[in-house]
Design a protein with these regions (language model features):
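Sec/Tat signal peptide C-region and signal peptidase I cleavage site
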Residues: 18-22
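Positively charged n-region of N-terminal signal peptides that target proteins for export
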Residues: 1-5
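Glycan-processing catalytic domains of CAZymes
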Residues: 23-383, 387-418
Length: 418
């Protein structure tokens, strides 16, 4: 017997009568005729568990750092040594970018002793500082640079065992010389550097409204290497508008984040939080005049969902990812599903996980960034379908209007067996 979820339409909430007292409004408590809602407390995840970072270089301005914290981030990004105190005061962590180190990491002629001397000088001030997550090394290296970057990474770990060297990789199709293909590029990185994680960037949303299938191909490739080497991966997604990339929308942010979650990612960064002073860059969370834009609220919303789902998500192990239709190259289709016999209602990405007690979990994602959609699904086994709310973190029986997904949105479901 299969467990089936059917979509039903409930009476619109607008038909309900709402009464709000001044005291309730202050506390964020709204009394409806049929239910009462209290604004939930959102606890930010630790970056060691799930990194949420505004990608780029962040000033030591107190208000700017407070805004980053309020937006749901647990990292401040890259900061110069003199700004570390401000990061600590804001309750964030950071990667330190030292001008005496990062410009020299591609210098293959520098001896190990010279590297260690520079690294020791950099880390000496911050070894016991809880706000220093690690140290910036390099962005987007080609494979021939891995060996030299490894020397710097080893020196950092030797000087400060708790520190993480930051190296971010190129996207699929842009890996450059020195590797046979993208899979080889990732494999070389994991083997040569012995890295504690994989970070990469890939921007796949365009101003004609399209989403490149390479979004999923890249996630597929990184997930395989991540699982093989038992290291987490972080994804840098599009958080501003530039070149021929799309204007920032909630649907676009939703898809990039929920797709990363469906593939088992353990970190999200947004390129960029501060708008660069160049070209057609726009729609970043903070514009060129240091004013917050509507993108800031969009980021806060999706970051809130990451932080709310996190306590459940972090207990899960990724076991499969598939597309029910429109299967991209190098990806799997519905016939690979471990838990579901049917998914209907649109074009979806589904991540499958095993949770505590061998509980089946699925994260279903609407691949349409422009339109909402209802969905239906059938589990292969019998049981009660449950949903973990992205707004409260509570897991309750699934049904009713929860069977709708916003553009790019996702839903975390599980099967409670009898």
């Amino acid at each position: 017997m299969q467990s089936t979820i059917l979509i039903t339409t409930l009476a619109a909430l607008t038909a309900l009568t709402m009464t709000v007292s001044a005291d309730q409004a202050t506390k964020g408590i709204y009394a409806y005729r049929s239910f009462q809602y209290e604004r939930p407390e959102i606890k930010t995840l630790a970056p060691e568990d799930f990194l949420i970072m505004p990608w780029g270089w962040t000033p030591g301005d107190e208000q700017a750092l407070k805004d980053i914290k309020d937006c749901g981030f647990n990292m401040a990004g890259f900061v110069t040594p003199e700004h570390v105190k401000a990061v600590q005061k804001a309750g964030l962590k950071c990667f330190v970018d030292d001008p005496n180190v990062s410009p020299f990491v591609t210098d293959g002629k520098m001896t190990d002793a010279e590297i260690e001397k520079r690294v020791d000088a950099m880390t000496a001030k911050f070894k016991d500082n809880p706000s220093v997550y690690g140290y910036y090394v390099m962005d987007e290296p080609i494979a021939p640079l891995f060996a030299n970057l490894t020397r710097w990474s080893k020196a950092i770990r030797k000087a400060d065992q708790s520190a993480t060297p930051y190296i971010n990789l190129l996207p699929i199709g842009a890996q450059g010389p020195g590797s046979k293909d993208y899979d080889d590029y990732l494999e070389q990185f994991a083997k040569v550097t012995n890295a504690a994680y994989i970070s990469y960037d890939h921007y796949t949303l365009f101003d004609d409204g399209s989403v490149s299938p390479s979004l999923y191909r890249n996630l597929e490739a990184v997930r395989k290497v991540s699982l093989k080497h038992r290291i987490p991966f972080w994804n840098i997604v599009l958080g501003n508008s530039h070149f021929h990339y799309a204007d920032v929308t909630q649907g676009g942010l939703n898809l990039q984040v929920y797709a990363t979650l469906a593939y088992g990612g353990r970190g999200i960064s947004y390129f960029t939080y501060f708008a660069p002073l160049a070209g057609n860059y726009r729609n970043a969370a903070v514009d060129q005049y240091l004013r917050k834009t509507p993108t800031w609220d969009m980021l806060r919303l999706i970051n809130s969902q990451i932080n709310t789902l996190g306590p459940t998500y972090l207990k899960l192990k990724s076991v499969n990812v598939f597309h029910n239709q429109d299967v991209p190259q190098d990806c799997l289709g519905m016939d690979s599903s471990k838990y579901l016999s049917e998914v209907s209602g649109g074009s979806f990405l589904v991540g499958e996980f095993v949770g505590p007690g061998n509980t089946p979990f699925v994260l279903i994602v609407n691949k349409d960034i422009h339109k909402s959609t209802g969905f239906g699904l059938k589990f292969k086994e019998q049981g009660t379908v449950m949903m973990t709310s992205p707004y409260t973190g509570e897991t309750k029986p699934f049904g009713g209007e929860n069977g709708w997904l916003a553009p790019g949105g996702g839903a975390m479901l599980s099967l409670k067996k009898p």
